[in-house]
Every structure is written in structure tokens, then in C-alpha cells.
Amino acid sequence: MGQGPAGFVDIPIAARYKPETRRIACKTAPEASFSRQSRHPTQPSMTSLSEAVARRRTFAIISHPDAGKTTLTEKLLLFGGAIQMAGAVKARGEQRRAHSDWMKVERERGISVASSVMTYDYDGKTFNLLDTPGHEDFSEDTYRTLTAVDSAVMVLDAAKGIEAQTLKLFEVCRLRDMPIITFVNKLDRESRDPFELLDEVEQRLALDVTPASWPIGMGRSFLGCYDLLHDRLLLVERSRDKMGAEGETCSGIDDPKLDELLPADAVAKLREDVEMVRELCPAFDREAYLQGTMTPVYFG
């Protein structure tokens, strides 16, 4: 037997299981320096635990395939400060790939086949973002994911509205009275009328809808959105992968600043639409949203 590291006896493997060897080892080894406290780390108090829970938001992004879930995930990570440059689902050449599609099969096929979890801090809160598969072949993974989240972001293709898989996933959320935020995506392509999309969500999903933003133009004439909650003008940033400006704050929809920043016909249409929205749609009700009976609708 030789002297091992830190004063321990170096015992041959064949002899380690003999009773007399175990007694020698116990006598020779230095006294353990682990205290009860180091073996059992101090548990957080109920106050600190409740504060940590209150800071945390866990949500899933759901939709029919190819509506833009993963692209939206990249933008949320970008604006949340978790990444410096957003990736693309179907990257070409040196273009950066999406962070949530990390498996080889996902990168080859340009689809998500398993849920990915990403965490980032923003505005004093910790967000757990789950990007889920949209294809029906992998829907079991999405169904299980929806049992572990507090809320969901439902992504709609502006040209197609509510599609088959979107409806199935919504029904899973409905069973849990889960709060849902609706995001109407791809407004820079040929799209359906936004009022028609709102009506479809209201009629088919039996939800009260309240627009949180409103598009300025559609398709090739899409210029950006007006933030109805904070009275901000959000113009399209042509740089698709880096952090853009936070928008132009306005004093209201009649602010002359809008006339300076937008074409006359776009301003007139925006004011007309916003007036109609505020007449026809209910104001945002936080309790109704938390109960799963109202969905705020964002366009982008």
C-alpha cells in the first residue's frame, strides 16, 4: 500500500473489498470535513421561492407548419438580448441558422421535430420560451409541452388564417383554460384583410379579440404597425437579423407626427381602421385574458 493523494491510502483494487482492508482505510483516511450544512445546501425560503416564481414566465409558441414559429422565436431571443443576431430556418451559405433548430434533421428539412426550450431575462422577468413542432407527425411532443406552460402564443399566417393544426393545438389549450396571445405573421406578403382575420378568430375559436397593434398597409405596401396599447409607430426594419429601433412614440392616432412619417393615404387608412377597431372591439381585460376567454392580437 502506498500513500495516495491528500493523505488517502492507495489500496490495490483486489484488496479493497476485504474486511481488514476497509478497517485500515477507515483508520488512515483523514477526518471528513463536510458539515451537515454543506451536505444539505440551505433551501430557499418560501418568500424567495414565491418571488422567483412570480418573476418567471413560461410560454409555448404554437401554429400550423410554416406559419413562422421558429422565426418568431429567433426575434424574441434577439429583442430579449439572448442573442446578437437572429438566425433563419432555411439558412443558405454563410447565413446563421435558427438557434432552436439544433438537430441535424431539423436543419436539413427546415422544420422543428422536437420542442426546444430557451431562457432569457427581460424587463426584470425570466422567460422560458418553448418552440414546438408544427407538423402533425410530431404533435405528441407539442401536446406534452402544453401541459407545462403558463400561456401560449398562437401564430397565424396572414394569408391563411386558422389552419387545421392550429385548431387542434388551440383545443388542447382550451381544455386547460390557457391564456393565448395571437400573432398574425407574414404581413409583408399578400394577406387577408385584418378585420376578416379578427372575425375568424372570434367566430371559430369563440374568443373575444382585442387588437394590441394594427398593420399599416399589407403585402408590398406594408410599412409597419401602430402599437395601440402604447401609441407607438413601429416602422418596418429592413435589417431582418439585427436589433431595430424601439419605435416613434405618438400622443395618439391624431398626432401630426404620423403625417410627417407616413404617406397621406396610409395615414388616412390607419386612422379610419383604428377608429373602427376601438368602436367594434372590446378593450383589453387582463382577467378575461388570464381566464382564456380573450386574446390580444398582434400583427407583424
Identify the residue ranges that each predicted region occupies.
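P-loop NTPase catalytic nucleotide-binding module
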Residues: 44-67, 86, 157-300
